């Protein structure tokens, strides 16, 4: 239940909305006076968006999802607007992904770069002392949840709001952020879980970084080999499914 609640609310990034729709469009140079002054609560992908939220459609691979979206507005091109239900109004642009990224940055300005978590504490200052086995120099952020019978290795950092289930082992020199980890998961030495993915768009004379506001969800009975990296999702999540075993030095990209 806790994992499901966190997946619905995303505790890792603060939504600064709602915003007036025309304000958002003006900020990305896509002003349209024919659109309403409706307040937009959030930006999400097609299958998770709800009423009073904005989504995007940029590829024919997602037209089936578009037909069922509950979003009120969708950034898309002329080629795909016919796939949207009557309840979802198309906002036409030839730069769907760039404009999606720019609006995401407005809602989640802290998602562009991975700042250091200034809430991390030595384990002696946390509730886990005596309940979880820790190596030396382990740091734990605010509101971290760790289940029973877990082990955290030397020099590892578990950043704020991360959830780790029962019977898990985290190796030495591991960094975990923006992640929900279920039961019986083994993450070996040197892994980095939940950092921002590699996403950007060329924009005039520079590159625009795509905000990464998704998470990493690691399901039951997973092992992740030494030195592996798993990037969090952009608008959706990166999911490592049940009973997955990854070898050493594997990179799993965002989404």
Short names for language-model regions:
Residues 1-124, 184, 190-191, 195-209, ...:
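Terminal amphipathic alpha-helical/low-complexity segments used for targeting or macromolecular assembly
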Residues 56, 120-255:
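Structural signal for interior beta-strand "rungs" in well-ordered beta-sheet cores
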């Amino acid at each position: 239940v806790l994992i499901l609640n966190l997946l619905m609310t995303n505790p890792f990034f603060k939504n600064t909305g709602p915003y007036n729709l025309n304000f958002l469009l003006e900020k990305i140079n896509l002003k349209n006076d024919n659109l309403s002054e409706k307040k937009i609560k959030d930006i999400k992908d097609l299958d998770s968006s709800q009423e009073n939220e904005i989504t995007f459609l940029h590829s024919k691979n997602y037209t089936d999802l578009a037909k069922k979206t509950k979003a009120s507005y969708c950034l898309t091109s002329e080629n795909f607007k016919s796939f949207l239900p009557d309840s979802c109004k198309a906002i036409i642009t030839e730069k769907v992904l760039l404009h999606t990224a720019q609006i995401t940055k407005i809602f989640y300005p802290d998602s562009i770069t991975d700042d250091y978590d200034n809430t991390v504490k030595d384990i002696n200052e946390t509730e886990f002392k005596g309940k979880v086995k820790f190596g030396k120099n382990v740091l734990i952020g605010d509101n971290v949840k760790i289940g029973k019978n877990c082990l955290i290795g030397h020099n590892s950092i578990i950043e704020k709001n991360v959830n780790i289930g029962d019977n898990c082992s985290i190796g030495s020199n591991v960094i975990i952020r923006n992640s929900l980890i279920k039961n019986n998961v083994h993450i070996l030495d040197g892994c980095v879980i939940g950092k921002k993915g590699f996403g950007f768009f060329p924009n005039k004379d520079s590159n625009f970084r795509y905000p990464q506001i998704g998470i990493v969800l690691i399901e039951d009975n997973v092992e992740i080999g030494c030195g592996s990296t798993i990037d969090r999702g952009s608008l959706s999540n990166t999911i490592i499914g049940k009973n997955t075993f990854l070898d050493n030095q594997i990179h799993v990209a965002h989404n």
